[in-house]
Swiss-Prot record:
Biased amino acid composition, Basic and acidic residues: 21-33
GO CC terms: bacterial nucleoid; cytosol
Cysteine disulfide links: none
Family: Belongs to the YbaB/EbfC family.
Keywords: Cytoplasm, DNA-binding
Pfam families tied to this protein: YbaB_DNA_bd (PF02575)
Name used for this protein in its record: Nucleoid-associated protein SAOUHSC_00444
Lineage of the species this protein comes from: Bacteria, Bacillati, Bacillota, Bacilli, Bacillales
Superkingdom of the source species: Bacteria
Biased composition (Low complexity): 7-16
Subunit structure: Homodimer.
Length: 105
């Protein structure tokens, strides 16, 4: 069979890439990414898997007469942390798929 060796080599490369990507996913699980808003008045920490693990709100951010502002700060900090987590994931996993012409990756 012609080309069989190439297919085997490609399968080995794919298995190796899958293993490396699984290892990176585990590392991302342990990463902590912080998003802030309001000049640091609100900080949200997420994992590389985008699980919120901590929310810090400084006392000066709490105004009982303006709860909406605090909500906006929490949302902004959360979105920043999630975006940073996406960027980190893309950076870490993207290096393993560079050069491959696989649809959807």
């Amino acid at each position: 069979m012609r080309g069989g060796g190439n297919m085997q080599q490609m399968m080995k490369q794919m298995q190796k890439m899958q293993k490396k990507m699984a290892q990176e996913q585990e590392k991302l699980k342990e990463e902590r990414i912080v998003g802030t808003a309001g000049g640091g008045m609100v900080a949200v920490t997420v994992t590389g898997h985008k699980e919120v693990v901590d929310v810090e709100i400084k006392e000066e951010a709490v105004d009982p007469d303006d709860i909406e502002m605090l909500q906006d700060l929490v949302l902004a900090a959360t979105n920043e942390a999630m975006n940073k987590a996406d960027e980190l994931t893309q950076e870490r996993l993207g290096k393993h798929t560079q050069g491959l012409n696989i649809p959807g990756m």
